[in-house]
Amino acid sequence: MNSTSLFLFSLLLLLVTGAIGKKTKEKFLQSEETVRESFSMGSRGHMSRSSEPEVFVRPQDSIGDEASEEMSSSSSSRRRSKIISSSSDGSNMEGESSYSKRKKSRFSQDALE
């Protein structure tokens, strides 16, 4: 009797697990299809009717503006890196470890002697 109930219980568990797995697989396929549809949609939220890719053309005068903006941002980043690289105690603010600070100070003391 005990082995029969164990067999029936394992059979029931197998059926329940299979049913749960099947439902999970169906939900996964549905969500995968939804993701595919959302990626195939156009940037405006509707399906693109033409098979040609959209090409964005930039006006000529905006190219020069962008170049000057890029140059000003690079000079400001240079200034920022100079500020970051030195602080009041001589260590950098980028996260120099205390171990490397001690190594540097020991090396400089050894070089002076």
Swiss-Prot record:
Residues 38-50, 83-98 have a biased composition (Low complexity). Belongs to the SVP2/SVP5/SVP6 family. Testis. Residues 31-113 are annotated as: Disordered. Its main location: secreted. It comes from the Eukaryota. Keywords: Secreted, Signal. InterPro entries: Svs4/5/6. It is found in: Secreted, Extracellular space. Residues 1-21 form the signal peptide. The keyword Secreted applies. It comes from Mus musculus (Mouse). Transmembrane segments: none annotated. Induction: By testosterone. GO terms for cellular component: extracellular region. This is Seminal vesicle secretory protein 4. It holds the Pfam family Svs_4_5_6.
